[in-house]
């Protein structure tokens, strides 16, 4: 068959056929698109719901709310955690039976009550819930007895239900008061260990009593942004050439991604920090998730860190000693709390993770709305497409945020905020010095009293008799006076700045009193100035109209009456 034998319509059909490419494509792009639709857990891309979903893939605690990833939409839906009602104590408990634990999704508010010299929690039951093992309907059996992860709630809806303030080991109430009490207990225990090993260090990320260069943020946050930009510049220089690094306002919640580090130390060389709330990502997609498990000893010395509910543990490593996280890694345990050190008597399950800051990237060529213009023009702010840090760094387990909109800048309030924080810190420090002075004085008085009671002054003094290492009076009254004097000088300086302002000192101090009278005086002055002119104009206009009316002639129109002669007969009398 030659070319001439091929019909023309076949040739036309060949040229009109669209080119089709076959293949699965880059899986990293698919993961990025999926995460752009899902968002981060605490962003609540699926919105807030009243009741928690019955079937979900993972759950993440976000302090004030709990995020659930349901199996139908995969967007994180959030449920607000119950709060302590007004009048936190109602007296005697309205229940006769008390449960060990009640899930937080079964009530909205709770109160404290007493029964038998013990404190319990009580609330009105809003719904029933069956206890679950593992993450929803995915069972995760750990050990022989401690396998229940999520508590339930059974009873009559609309009636009071009471339960213990302390949950059993390895049982979670879904971010309710029992989980918060467990977190506080673990935090206190870690703080005790930290105080016994390291000196106390006071630092507040927002306290800037003095200017620290041109930056308007604290040094720690600035160093974090600098390190993030350096890493971004090495991994993706095109994006780092011109971009914005955006930090969310409020308490930071870092991102936790799985770590491949398998080295676990048991010494105390690692830093000990309080439990840190994180957002675990990509753990639900792990095929081989390795978890660390320490069984409970069923005693009061157990430090219950909880069980993980955001991943399925395929392999479990039993641990019976303290753990120190490897460099740049943390242990993420129950209620997605991160730890750098787990004490000897810890119990629960944890996974090893790497933390990254919750920073979003806005490319330099992306249109960013100006908040001030949008505010004054009453326009809705345009959505800014953020690029998550994980995508910018080229990590395959990339995550995108569901955040839209850009927060208002607080640069204008930096000076005022810094000054207010400085004043509050100075007052707080002064009160603390007063308290230290009172404590020191009380200790000295107590030592003298004990020494006088024992009559041991002749044996070398009270300190030697009592074998006290510290026997002096820490007089901080001078420091208190200096700080109060500094505050007074600062206030006097501000008053002087106000007094030196010509706006308030003009006319020998009479200007502030004359300002309220300025408006009526101005109105009176305008009336006196332009009143006669306006009055003359009105009089002239009226006179002109009257003259025009008088100048017009009066026209009178009349007609002669017609006389009608009928030609009648007249009688003539002679």
Swiss-Prot record:
Residues 446-462 are annotated as: Immunosuppression. Residues 407-457, 467-503 form a coiled coil. A motif (YXXL motif) lies at residues 558-561. Residues 1-22 form the signal peptide. Specific enzymatic cleavages in vivo yield mature proteins. Envelope glycoproteins are synthesized as an inactive precursor that is N-glycosylated and processed likely by host cell furin or by a furin-like protease in the Golgi to yield the mature SU and TM proteins. The cleavage site between SU and TM requires the minimal sequence [KR]-X-[KR]-R. The R-peptide is released from the C-terminus of the cytoplasmic tail of the TM protein upon particle formation as a result of proteolytic cleavage by the viral protease. Cleavage of this peptide is required for TM to become fusogenic. A motif (CXXC) lies at residues 243-246. Residues 536-574 are cytoplasmic. A motif (CX6CC) lies at residues 463-471. InterPro entries: TLV/ENV_coat_polyprotein. The mature envelope protein (Env) consists of a trimer of SU-TM heterodimers attached by a labile interchain disulfide bond. This is Envelope glycoprotein. It comes from Simian retrovirus SRV-2 (isolate 2R-18B1). The lineage of its organism: Viruses, Riboviria, Pararnavirae, Artverviricota, Revtraviricetes.
């Amino acid at each position: 068959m030659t070319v001439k034998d091929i019909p023309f319509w076949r040739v036309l059909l060949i040229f009109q056929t669209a080119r089709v490419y076959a293949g699965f494509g880059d899986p990293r792009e698919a993961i990025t698109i999926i995460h752009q639709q899902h968002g981060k857990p605490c962003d609540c891309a699926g919105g807030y719901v009243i009741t928690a979903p019955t079937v979900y893939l993972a759950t993440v605690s976000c302090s004030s709310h709990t995020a659930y990833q349901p199996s139908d939409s995969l967007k994180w839906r959030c449920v607000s955690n119950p709060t302590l009602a007004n009048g936190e104590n109602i007296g005697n408990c309205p229940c006769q039976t008390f449960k060990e634990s009640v899930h937080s999704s079964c009530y909205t508010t709770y109160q404290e009550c007493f029964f038998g010299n013990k404190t319990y929690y009580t609330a009105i039951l809003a719904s029933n819930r069956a206890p679950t093992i593992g993450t929803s309907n995915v069972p995760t059996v750990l050990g022989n007895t401690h396998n229940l992860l999520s508590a339930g709630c059974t009873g009559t809806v609309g009636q009071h239900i009471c339960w213990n303030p302390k949950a059993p080991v390895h049982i979670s109430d879904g971010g309710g008061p029992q989980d918060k009490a467990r977190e506080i207990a673990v935090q206190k225990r870690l703080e005790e260990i930290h105080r016994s090993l390291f000196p106390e260090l006071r630092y507040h990320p927002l306290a800037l009593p003095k200017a620290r260069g041109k930056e308007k943020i604290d040094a720690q946050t600035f160093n974090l942004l600098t390190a993030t930009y350096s890493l971004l510049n090495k991994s993706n220089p095109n994006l780092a050439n011109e971009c914005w690094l955006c930090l969310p306002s409020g308490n930071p919640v870092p991102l936790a991604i799985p770590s491949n580090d398998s080295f676990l130390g048991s010494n105390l060389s690692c830093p000990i920090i309080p439990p840190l709330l994180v957002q675990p990502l990509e753990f639900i997609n792990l095929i081989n998730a390795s978890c660390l498990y320490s069984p409970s000893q069923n005693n009061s010395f157990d430090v219950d860190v909880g069980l993980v509910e955001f991943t399925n543990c395929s392999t479990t490593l039993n641990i019976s000693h303290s753990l120190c996280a490897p460099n740049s890694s943390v242990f993420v345990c129950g209620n997605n709390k991160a730890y750098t050190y787990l004490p000897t008597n810890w119990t629960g399950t944890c996974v090893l993770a790497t933390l990254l800051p919750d920073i979003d990237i806005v490319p330099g060529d992306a249109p960013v709305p100006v908040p001030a213009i949008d505010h004054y023009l009453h326009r809705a702010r345009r959505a800014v497409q953020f690029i998550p840090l994980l995508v910018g760094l080229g990590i395959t387990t990339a995550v995108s945020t569901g955040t839209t909109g850009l927060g208002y800048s607080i640069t204008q309030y930096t000076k005022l905020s810094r000054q207010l924080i400085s004043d509050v810190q100075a007052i707080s420090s002064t009160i603390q010095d007063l308290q230290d002075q009172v404590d020191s004085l009380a200790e000295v008085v107590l030592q003298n009293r004990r020494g006088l009671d024992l009559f041991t002054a002749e044996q070398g003094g009270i300190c030697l008799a009592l074998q006290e290492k510290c026997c002096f009076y820490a007089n901080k009254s001078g420091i208190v006076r200096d700080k109060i004097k500094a505050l007074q000088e600062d206030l006097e300086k501000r008053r002087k700045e106000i007094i030196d302002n010509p706006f308030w000192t003009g006319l020998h101090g009479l200007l502030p009193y004359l300002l309220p009278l300025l408006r009526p005086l101005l109105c009176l002055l305008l009336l006196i100035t332009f009143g006669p002119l306006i009055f003359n104009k009105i009089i002239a206009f009226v006179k002109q109209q009257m003259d025009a009316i008088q100048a017009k002639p009066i026209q009178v129109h009349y007609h002669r009456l017609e006389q009608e002669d009928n030609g009648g007969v007249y009688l003539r009398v002679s």
